[in-house]
Amino acid sequence: MFVDIAKIYVKAGDGGDGIVAFRREKYVPAGGPAGGDGGKGGDVIFVADRELNTLLDFKYKRHYKAQNGERGGPNNMHGKDGEDLIIKVPVGTVIKDAETGEIIADLSREGDRAIVAHGGRGGRGNAHFATATRQVPRFAEVGEKGDELWVILELKVLADVGLIGYPNVGKSTFLSVATNARPEIANYPFTTKYPNLGIVYISEGESFVLADIPGLIEGASEGAGLGHQFLRHVERTKVLIHIVDVSGSEGREPVEDFIKINEELKKYSPELAQKPQIVAANKMDLPDAQAYFELFKEEIEKMGYEVYPISAATGMGIREVLKRAYELLKQQKAAENIEEDAKPRTFVYYKKKDVKPLTVRKENGVYVVEGTVVEKVARNIVLNDHDSFRYFQNFLNKLGVFDKLREMGIQDGDIVRILDVEFEYYE
């Protein structure tokens, strides 16, 4: 089964907690704090692998989580970092943030990497909180949470040349004759529901990848038929072979079909419509095809396109079309200065997080303090003794929280809440 789109959840590892510990050595009577820091959580990293050609695995498994960092140890021992989670995807995979639609990375080269979720920082051990006036801190930080998000994976087939045209015009037959591919072929529309790939050999050392893309219909740019699936794959190709049935056997109007498909390409992407395009007038082996062809050729050449008469059923004219496609492909690669041995790239994504300003409001008699900075500290410090609470109070004072509370008329004994932390206020 060919699967070319998937939605999955990824979660980076949480940071390990810092710990509270003190040196316990025989000849060191006042060893001081020695709690180690927690390890960093593992990242979630996507890697492009040319051995894969479908997103099928993600149909059955949709949740992925990297390893958490380990707790710190005594004697200032740093906790072990969590292992990164490597997720392999086919070359040609585009990764998007499912919430915003933002493109995170386009993994179009073998070995391309995308770090999409970052592991949480490890919490600091109590050794970090020792000061001249707080020589025996009995508190530490917990590790930060790792990033989490839903992402959409879209596979865009990496073919050099794409076969386009209305359903049932002979694209699959053309592919089977031109390559060793064995696509499903039948006399009804949308036989091809997924891209079929084959290798075209022009001569020794000269070849290209040819894709039979699912049939396109009017309205495809708005998603009709297999529209968006079709157009997503066409984006990757550098040259298009537009196959048109000129026999009239299906009761269609060849020139009208040609114009409509190019209109759909342009609606979806103006760049797509500018790709070099060879027109292959198919089914020339059928009766009356020659008469239709002469009229068709005259109209299409007026638009500036090259037209080749072919018969996918007999093989007539196909070699000439393939040679011309290869010539155009070489020109495109030279113009784009594409390096076949281009080095892999690394994409790094940081999901934008809302930064909340410091605010204080009164709700049901409780003073509620909110803000990104103050909430981060409240989340990371375990407030379980006098030392930790004193540290937290000093932080709030420096941040200006107490000044805001006084401005609002707070009285001794009133309750203050930050996240799930509540305490009584006293001057």
Swiss-Prot record:
Name of the gene this protein is made from: obg
Swiss-Prot/TrEMBL cofactor(s): Mg(2+)
Binding site for Mg(2+): S172, T192
Family membership noted in the UniProt record: Belongs to the TRAFAC class OBG-HflX-like GTPase superfamily. OBG GTPase family.
All copies of domain OBG-type G, residue ranges: 159-330
SUPFAM superfamilies given in the database record: Obg GTP-binding protein C-terminal domain, Obg GTP-binding protein N-terminal domain, P-loop containing nucleoside triphosphate hydrolases
Protein name, entry field: GTPase Obg
EC number(s) from the headed UniProt entry: 3.6.5.-
Ranges where the Obg domain occurs: 1-158
Keyword GTP-binding in record: yes
Pfam family, one: GTP1_OBG
Quaternary context: Monomer.
CDD domains: Obg
Keyword match Cell cycle: no
